[in-house]
């Protein structure tokens, strides 16, 4: 390809890199349109209203004004891209049908602003995107043709995979995405962990797993934002994020379509693994837009060890 992993000798922009990936023009166009939309989202994050919108999403959660605005930005860009037939957003109650014609088109599921409640305290947030070929969004995550996230932190970075390596781009002063890391790979074992959920609600197996990680010398690194926490695990190449089943919440908190599938697709293609404690996240057949699942995601050996503890419990 263009460079060794983690190195970029020349300024390679997103579109040029996508053209090297042996994918069709429509998919290149779609990913670039999402990247363009993110430029408006980051502007909204930096300057937008931090109050509530007075509405709720399909999970009954109160929507922030930034959630609604970010969703509107992303949805409008997807509709006018000309290559999308169905859209599902964490902020919408049902699938938005752009066209009944699925020939050569894609369906997109996304979380427009994951971690939006962290904006008012100036912590990192992000956009998460899952792309399927055709009009069926309720497929196993393994059938995704692409997945990506955009992290809005001190720098704005975009990470994507189309099934052939995981690559990072960083927004420059001209708001262009240039390649900064190529073919990112996870190590087999890690030394950081990001545990979500209240620990006093953990099941016995998860509590024992946490004690195992602590005894191993793993460092706790948790921001409360799914995108920055996954980004840390991926970029360090060593670690684990977990949001397990909790007492009273057997399916955990995170959404399969909008959060888990795209992140699992990215991590697996970087040499990592993702499971709900029993089977790979990417093998779960979704039954609805609002489906949730526990997750253990990161280095293969840590994920396998988590499964052992969960299975024993």
Curated annotation (Swiss-Prot):
Subcellular location per the Swiss-Prot or TrEMBL entry: Cytoplasm
Keywords, in A-Z order: Carbohydrate metabolism, Cytoplasm, Hydrolase, Magnesium, Metal-binding
GO terms assigned for molecular function: fructose 1,6-bisphosphate 1-phosphatase activity; magnesium ion binding
Positions contributing to substrate binding: 114-117, 222, 253
Residues reported to bind Mg(2+) 2: 111, 114, 259
Cellular component terms per the entry's GO annotation: cytosol
Bridged cysteine pairs (disulfide): none
Catalytic activity annotation: beta-D-fructose 1,6-bisphosphate + H2O = beta-D-fructose 6-phosphate + phosphate
Alphabetized InterPro entries for the sequence: FBPase_C_dom, FBPase_class-1, FBPase_N, FBPtase, Fructose_bisphosphatase_AS, SBPase
Cofactor binding remark: Binds 2 magnesium ions per subunit.
Pathway stated in the Swiss-Prot or TrEMBL entry: Carbohydrate biosynthesis; gluconeogenesis
Cofactors, names only: Mg(2+)
UniProt: Mg(2+) 1 binding residues: 90, 111, 113
Any one of the GO BP annotations: fructose 6-phosphate metabolic process
Top-level class of the enzyme under EC nomenclature: hydrolase
EC number(s) recorded for this UniProt protein: 3.1.3.11
SUPFAM superfamilies xref list: Carbohydrate phosphatase
Subunit and interaction comment: Homotetramer.
HAMAP family per record: FBPase_class1
Family of the protein in this entry: Belongs to the FBPase class 1 family.
Name of the protein in its database record: Fructose-1,6-bisphosphatase class 1
Protein source organism: Geotalea uraniireducens (strain Rf4)
């Amino acid at each position: 390809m263009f460079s060794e992993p983690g190195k970029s000798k020349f300024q390679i922009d997103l579109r040029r890199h996508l053209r090297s990936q042996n994918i069709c023009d429509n998919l290149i166009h779609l990913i670039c349109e999402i990247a363009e939309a993110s430029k408006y989202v980051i502007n909204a994050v930096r300057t937008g209203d931090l109050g509530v919108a007075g509405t709720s999403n399909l999970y009954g959660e109160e929507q922030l004004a930034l959630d609604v605005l970010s969703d509107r930005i992303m949805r409008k860009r997807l509709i006018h891209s000309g290559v999308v037939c169905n859209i599902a957003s964490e902020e919408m109650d049902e699938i938005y049908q752009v066209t009944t014609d699925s020939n050569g088109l894609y369906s997109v599921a996304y979380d427009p602003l994951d971690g939006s409640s962290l904006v008012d305290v100036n912590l990192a947030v992000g956009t998460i995107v899952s792309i399927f070929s055709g009009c069926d969004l309720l497929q196993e995550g393994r059938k995704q043709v692409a997945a990506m996230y955009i992290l809005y932190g001190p720098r704005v970075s975009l990470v994507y995979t189309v099934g052939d390596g995981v690559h990072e781009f960083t927004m420059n002063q001209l708001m262009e995405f240039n390649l900064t890391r190529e073919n990112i790979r996870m190590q087999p074992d890690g030394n950081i962990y990001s545990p979500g959920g209240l620990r006093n609600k953990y099941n016995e197996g998860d509590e024992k797993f946490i004690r195992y990680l602590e005894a191993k010398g793993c460092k706790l690194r948790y921001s409360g934002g799914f995108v920055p926490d996954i980004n840390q695990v991926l970029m360090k190449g060593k670690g684990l994020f977990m949001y397990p089943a909790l007492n009273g919440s057997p399916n955990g908190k995170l959404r399969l379509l909008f959060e888990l599938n795209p992140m699992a697709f990215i991590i697996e293609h970087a040499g990592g693994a993702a499971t709900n404690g029993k089977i790979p996240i990417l093998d779960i057949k979704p039954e609805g837009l609002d489906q949730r699942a526990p997750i253990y995601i990161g280095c293969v050996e840590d994920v396998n060890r988590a499964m052992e503890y969960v299975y024993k419990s």
